[in-house]
């Protein structure tokens, strides 16, 4: 995924009301930009740290700027626009980068499924049957470790998705939880038991029921983001 034009850079002053952030440009101009992230953004940002944002030319938008990338307290880069994850994964799927899911004949987005009224991010059609793929964006890192964690806040919705996938797996239908790691300097992923123990239990239960768990890391900068490598998932604390 190429940013065109390339992202603009600023310095974070504050994030507030979940969806707003004030930044300062190099020339001293201050802007309010949209924050497209409903999570806690734990360890994803710091006041005074560098941020990169895209700018829309749509005159109907109240806030033309959208926060895309943040400098973390550990000096990493994190893509904080969670809406990018599905597009990145689709791009990687179509390019054959995600080897475990290569060879599909059709791809459908946001397909209704399950007993709890969910929509799966992708349904892939293979000659031998479908695969249901749920995507989660991972941006939580910690100091002195290259292991990222998910989630960064309690997510009942995330646990519901795991239950839905587990139900499919028990029926013999291929079900995949895919973590898109939009954070530099990461070598593995784990469930964040310390933040949401219920989600971590649901993940381990889903794996026991046959759900596949994959993680792929992304390379990112102000010009592009691209999924480029598989990462191990560490299920045991």
Curated annotation (Swiss-Prot):
GO molecular function: DNA binding
Any Pfam family hit: SfsA_N
Domain of life: Bacteria
Family, per entry: Belongs to the SfsA family.
Name of this chain's protein: Sugar fermentation stimulation protein homolog
Organism: Pseudomonas putida (strain W619)
Gene: sfsA
